[in-house]
From Swiss-Prot:
GO terms for molecular function: (3R)-hydroxyacyl-[acyl-carrier-protein] dehydratase activity; trans-2-decenoyl-acyl-carrier-protein isomerase activity. Necessary for the introduction of cis unsaturation into fatty acids. Catalyzes the dehydration of (3R)-3-hydroxydecanoyl-ACP to E-(2)-decenoyl-ACP and then its isomerization to Z-(3)-decenoyl-ACP. Can catalyze the dehydratase reaction for beta-hydroxyacyl-ACPs with saturated chain lengths up to 16:0, being most active on intermediate chain length. It comes from the Bacteria. Transmembrane segments: none annotated. GO terms for cellular component: cytoplasm. It is found in: Cytoplasm. Gene3D superfamilies: Hotdog Thioesterase. Keywords: Cytoplasm, Fatty acid biosynthesis, Fatty acid metabolism, Isomerase, Lipid biosynthesis, Lipid metabolism, Lyase. Pfam families: FabA. This is 3-hydroxydecanoyl-[acyl-carrier-protein] dehydratase. The gene is fabA. Homodimer. Belongs to the thioester dehydratase family. FabA subfamily. GO terms for biological process: unsaturated fatty acid biosynthetic process.
Length: 174
């Protein structure tokens, strides 16, 4: 039975990473350290900018996060690709939450703009994804717009994030 709460704590996210929320192999989140948020604070099917769904998540930023120690020595900054990956992770989670089956894969995006950085003094990152479209055929495909804020300043904007759920052996390159 699929888990349809409107929010998830860290343990719930780990359960998703272990394949315990949506069934084995279905829309699993990565496990730490690649899990890029600590909780989902809101998920629904009729909210967001387009009225087709919303998912919002948060990351508590601590100076000892794994990426600050290696990116870059003496100039710590969260890699922009990790914030982008968090947005893709959230689209995949939404697809599983709405009943989609298959393994999640990021498929691209239309546009990405960075106007700031996540640095060690930042206390909280908020991710927001507004679902634009979900298609269900041989694969489940989600298209969404998203943003990332650092201490309430929106610093990343992504348009047309694309994530697909693929049945085993049917993913890109298979």
């Amino acid at each position: 039975m699929q888990d349809r709460r409107s929010s998830y704590d860290y343990e719930g996210l780990l359960a998703c990473g272990r394949g315990e929320l949506f069934g084995p192999g279905n829309a699993q989140l990565p496990l730490p350290p690649m899990l890029m948020f600590d909780r989902i604070t809101d998920i629904n099917e009729d909210g967001g900018e387009f009225g087709k769904g919303l998912i919002r998540a948060e990351l508590d930023v601590k100076p000892d996060l794994w990426f600050f120690g290696c990116h870059f020595k003496g100039d710590p900054v969260m890699p922009g690709c990790l914030g982008l990956d968090a947005l893709w992770q959230m689209v995949g989670f939404f697809l599983g939450w709405t009943g989609g089956e298959g393994r999640g894969r990021a498929l691209g995006l239309g546009e990405l703009k960075f106007t700031g950085q996540v640095l060690p003094p930042v206390r909280k990152v908020v991710y927001n994804v507004d679902i634009k479209r979900v298609m269900r055929s041989k694969l489940v495909l989600g298209i969404a717009d998203g943003w990332l804020s650092a201490d309430d300043d929106i610093i990343y904007r992504a348009k047309d994030l694309k994530v697909g759920l693929f049945k085993q052996d049917a993913g890109p390159g298979a």
